[in-house]
Amino acid sequence: MDDSRKAYVVAQDLHNAIMQRDAITISEITGRYVSGYREKIALAFMEQYNVLPADLFKEWGTGYFESLMIRCWTNRHEARAKMLKEAIRGALDRDALVDLVILCSTDDWASTLVHYQKHFRIALKADIRLNMPADRPWKALIDRWMEHDRHYRNNVKTDAHMLLQALEGGNGAAIVDILVTTKPQEWEKIVAAYEEHTNKSLETAICMAFPGFEQTAFCAAHYWLCEPSKAAAFLIHRACEGKRGDFRRVCRITSLVLDQCLKCKYVYSVYGHLAADFRKTFSDNTAIPLISLWRAYDIGKILAEKHENIT
């Protein structure tokens, strides 16, 4: 089956699932394709039904599942741009800024800049800086991360020592400087040298040196440079802490970087089990679609277990 025909067939399957309000099938279809291909499916959907999938989900209401599907079936660069505007409109949403700015590839950031300018008639970086003075280390991290200006430092041992000094002295500015200028390939080597010398993980050292929000921002940046899936796992774990959980964070990460973070279910093992944490934190109406999207567990087994418990 050629690519365009396949998109039409998938669009029909998605439409049938939406008409039947079959959340499991919708989630399975959504998670099967990368975001770029979902856009092709959405176009085929529009040609056949004269409406976009996201618009049909909007008619369902404003629940967690609907919100997640709306984001997943919207162009991810457009979605990121709109969420960034929400994050700086009114009270600053620092959690959203970490999710949206730190967990973003260079190519995705360039596309987001274009969409932001198109929708809001102002440059994204300028708008963020107007609304967020860099008066805290985590804000400076966001500010400088937006430049995506990295280079090879070519001195791993020296940089590992600088990192050690910055952490021992609680020097947030120095931590920011090395995080925002180092290429991912070299960051891994610097971290390995640091951890070999100190015999403790960098995350542990960051948590000891920075008890405030810098802890979250610095750890997210550190993990994104090492492996995007580790950053997703770290923040999803944070989102699953507490009684209610932070669905907005989980929704942002799932809809924007799922394709780039499919190792998340494996690296999450340092915190526990991804599927179990989703089910512990959210109702099954929300947790099961999330588990399906992240391919964290066999959905058929979950449904069978639920059926056995009922009977």
Swiss-Prot record:
Gene3D superfamilies: Annexin. Annexin repeats lie at residues 5-73, 75-146, 154-223, 227-295. The keyword Repeat applies. Its main location: cytoplasm. GO terms for cellular component: cytoplasm; microtubule; plasma membrane. InterPro entries: Alpha_giardin (IPR008088), Annexin_repeat (IPR018502), Annexin_sf (IPR037104). Disulfide bonds: none annotated. Pfam families: Annexin, ANXE1_4th. Keywords: Annexin, Cytoplasm, Cytoskeleton, Microtubule, Repeat. The keyword Repeat applies. It comes from the Eukaryota. GO terms for molecular function: calcium ion binding; calcium-dependent phospholipid binding; phosphatidylserine binding. GO terms for biological process: cytoskeleton organization. Belongs to the annexin family. Giardin subunit alpha subfamily. Giardins are involved in parasite attachment to the intestinal mucosa and in the cytoskeletal disassembly and reassembly that marks the transition from infectious trophozoite to transmissible cyst. They may interact with other cytoskeletal proteins such as microtubules in the microribbons or crossbridges, to maintain the integrity of the ventral disk. This is Giardin subunit alpha-8. It comes from Giardia intestinalis. The lineage of its organism: Eukaryota, Metamonada, Diplomonadida, Hexamitidae, Giardiinae.
